[in-house]
């Protein structure tokens, strides 16, 4: 039962089987919209969202590890929880450090859109050290950490232009 839950968790249920192309992109877009809704419409505090994301990060590691035996590849495209984790990084850091500026929902959505675009660029191009992690670590750590690095690259890139 727990293995089935882990499988559904790491594939974000609907993206594992329903979406056949661009799973990572769809999962990243889902993440942006999900976080936007819970922060700007449901008004869940950034502290609570941060704790939730940390729990998801930790659980993702164990869920991916237990689910990998169900796949032939070492980094299967069906696993998209890593995109969720990586895409969450720039969003939650933005909210932690800039959330007090009272952005309108429209302004926040525009900013989140840039996070989405940049995350997909860094996740796709895999600049160093993302490419190194992606090639060197064909395991749970590699699956998660390359997307974490892509999220960090988004933060670094936008920090340079002072968003």
State the predicted function of each range.
Residues 1-27, 62-89, 120-152:
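Interhelical loop and helix-boundary elements at the membrane-water interface
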Residues 25-30, 50-54, 109, 113-117, ...:
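Hydrophobic alpha-helical transmembrane segments
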Residues 30-42, 91-95, 138:
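Interfacial segments of multi-pass membrane proteins
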Residues 38-68:
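N-terminal leader/targeting helix
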Residues 89-104:
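C-terminal halves and exits of single transmembrane alpha-helices
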């Amino acid at each position: 039962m727990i293995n089935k839950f882990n499988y559904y968790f790491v594939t974000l249920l609907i993206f594992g089987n329903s979406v056949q192309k661009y799973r990572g992109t769809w999962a990243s877009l889902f993440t942006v919209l999900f976080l936007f809704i819970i922060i700007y419409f449901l008004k869940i505090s950034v502290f609570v969202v941060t704790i939730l994301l940390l729990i998801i990060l930790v659980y993702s590691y164990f869920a991916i590890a237990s689910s990998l035996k169900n796949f032939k590849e070492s980094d299967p495209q069906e696993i998209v929880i890593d995109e969720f984790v990586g895409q969450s990084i720039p969003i939650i850091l933005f909210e932690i450090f800039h959330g007090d500026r009272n952005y309108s929902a429209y302004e926040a959505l525009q900013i989140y859109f840039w996070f989405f675009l940049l995350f997909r660029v860094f996740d796709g191009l895999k600049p160093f050290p993302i490419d190194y992690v992606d090639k060197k670590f064909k395991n749970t750590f590699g699956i998660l950490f390359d997307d974490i690095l892509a999220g960090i690259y988004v933060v670094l890139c936008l920090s340079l232009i002072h968003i």
